[in-house]
């Protein structure tokens, strides 16, 4: 009979209680911060539109923003990329000053007339405020990662009024093709609480309505197939434009950094260019958040070039170093692009605007599930099918690129494009591999041989960790012992987070450790003393570093190091029949 300590549901209760409390506090912080941000942006936008002469001072605003970050905020200047990098490779608590600095910088951008959004600001405020709980609660390792994800979800949900999409966004944005479910509960709680708190502060979100939604039923083959093909075509266009936005923004940023050595001068020069451009086009519809134009895209026909103009203004603003988010401009670009596509596609204007609204955002952020859920939250369930098709297609067409350079590639978007797992978007081009077609001439396609410069490497090492099935992470207090995870779950996760190339937990039928009694798995109740073997494959230096870093977690583990080499192709003697 199982003991109480072995019942999974019982073990889950302390974790649920723990993260319910932490995520609620994080949600309150995120909701309050987002309310302050939204109220500040509304004031800045109204003041700017009533005093258009302030746009002429955009270079001055850029210089001030650049000076503040250069002398006070250097450690947090990376913004969202710092958050993602800290989740993947935790080093130190996000400085508290990230929150007030990004709030001030974003308000200055909108006050003086830059084109930016608010999502990046909300994410940075939410995550940095939530991360301050790390010091109070002494959170480490995976708990701190979950806390940062919780702050991201709370910030996203509260600033856009989409709690379900916000919860999924915090899980999905970390890596392309993979979702971290370990933070699902806390992200969901923080998203719901954050949205609720923002509303309680008296903040109201924009209401988007779709005029009509046609049927995609294939029972009416001509009408249904036309709608389906239109959604696919629109999704492809949305993905390509999202790719263009991401690459243009990064390219402009690279040009400014390579040509202007003193960072504060970059937003000053960029601000001068934007101010001149606003004067040249004779309208302010392409700066700021652009909410009125987004709303118009659902109801009236707009000039077909609006999306391109907003793309250019936003890419220049963010590339020059102004602070603010990318997502609301992506909403603008997508909605106006969908509006333009209604001139050639047999779908309602409002529906295409809604599809573009979420499609361009989802593909630029590489978060298709969050964007689909957002469409359902904002536009209603009937829009889900069209949004789903366009978001998935746009995600595929945007390639391995995106607005977050620190985002990792967890799984290639295309079966015949092989990418090393864990590579960031910033380094993706140098890690792209050509697919192999001949299994017998090159078994590297199965991952058996690690290649370097076209030649097999012979320096891999196997680290075998032996422990009992019932062994758990060492805990000093009764509470720690009660909530400690089992080693057979904890150690593979540590290996994955540390970046170990390969980890395999072998299933053991029978055995014993260090002269203990012989135990066997009789498939009813697994004996606590049954041996477990976790085998890690990587370079010896990496494995030794793993043991050093996690020595406290390996107290009950017998460690065996086996030096070996990769077997090159010519030694395998494989012949095709």
What is the predicted function of each stretch?
Residues 1-437:
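Alpha-helical transmembrane segments and immediately membrane-proximal extracytoplasmic
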Residues 436-577:
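Positively charged, small/polar-rich N-terminal and surface patches that mediate targeting and assembly
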